[in-house]
Amino acid sequence: MMFPLARNALSSLKIQSILQSMARHSHVKHSPDFHDKYGNAVLASGTAFCVATWVFTATQIGIEWNLSPVGRVTPKEWKHQ
């Protein structure tokens, strides 16, 4: 069991080290990496490709989707045994 004084000292040290680390990172010049430069373009082109592929699939290759059986299914007569 830690004494309250030691526990407070350790927690304040952790907080100070976190704050110092954040201050160091905020002063560093951030050079753009791949995601900063091309991230939105890659995301937009990937989305456009997926949408175009699904639109083509849904409309052009002749899949019979069978969304509703109304008008296609007729009930059969009961067979009495």
Swiss-Prot record:
Residues in compartment: Mitochondrial matrix: 26-33
Presequence range in chain numbering: 1-25
UniProt keyword Transit peptide present: yes
GO cellular component terms, A-Z: mitochondrial inner membrane; mitochondrion; respiratory chain complex IV
SUPFAM superfamilies, per database record: Mitochondrial cytochrome c oxidase subunit VIIb (SSF81423)
Membrane topology label: Single-pass membrane protein
Transmembrane segments: 34-60
Job description of the protein: Component of the cytochrome c oxidase, the last enzyme in the mitochondrial electron transport chain which drives oxidative phosphorylation. The respiratory chain contains 3 multisubunit complexes succinate dehydrogenase (complex II, CII), ubiquinol-cytochrome c oxidoreductase (cytochrome b-c1 complex, complex III, CIII) and cytochrome c oxidase (complex IV, CIV), that cooperate to transfer electrons derived from NADH and succinate to molecular oxygen, creating an electrochemical gradient over the inner membrane that drives transmembrane transport and the ATP synthase.
Protein name: Cytochrome c oxidase subunit 7B2, mitochondrial
